[in-house]
Every structure is written in C-alpha cells, then in structure tokens.
Amino acid sequence: MSNNMAKIAEARKTVEQLKLEVNIDRMKVSQAAAELLAFCETHAKDDPLVTPVPAAENPFRDKRLFCVLL
C-alpha cells in the first residue's frame, strides 16, 4: 500500500512541475544563439579577456619591484 502511495505522490510532484513549466516562454535555439552572438560582439570591447587591460591601468600588476636572493 505504501508503495502505491509513494507512486501517487511522485506523480503529483511531476504534475505540479509540469504545470509550472507550461508557462515558461521558449525561443528557438537559432534565435537564442543569434542574440548571444550579437551580445558578445557588442560587449567584446569591454571584456578584458578579449581586449587586454593596458599595463598602466591594471590594478593587479605588481606595485614595486623586488629581488629574491636564492
């Protein structure tokens, strides 16, 4: 009997999840890819991995030189 109740509970969870998912707006993968590509091309100039930060503006560069003796 408990096995049957567990299956019913699982089916109810599945139905509730499907009710939530039915209202999700969807788009074609080709449209999403085109929008992503356009976004990347638009913001490429601001991306430090695509356009390196000039050394003078790099906040992570070493501030002073030092010598390590071995």
UniProtKB/Swiss-Prot annotation:
Localisation: Cell membrane
Pfam families referenced in this protein's UniProt entry, alphabetically: G-gamma
Membrane topology: Lipid-anchor
SUPFAM superfamilies: Transducin (heterotrimeric G protein), gamma chain (SSF48670)
Main location: membrane
InterPro entries xref list: G-protein_gamma-like_dom, GGL_sf, Gprotein-gamma
Residues carrying Cysteine methyl ester: 67
Subunit text: G proteins are composed of 3 units, alpha, beta and gamma.
The family this protein is said to belong to: Belongs to the G protein gamma family.
Role description: Guanine nucleotide-binding proteins (G proteins) are involved as a modulator or transducer in various transmembrane signaling systems. The beta and gamma chains are required for the GTPase activity, for replacement of GDP by GTP, and for G protein-effector interaction.
UniProt protein name: Guanine nucleotide-binding protein G(I)/G(S)/G(O) subunit gamma-8
Native source organism of the sequence: Homo sapiens (Human)
Gene coding for it: GNG8
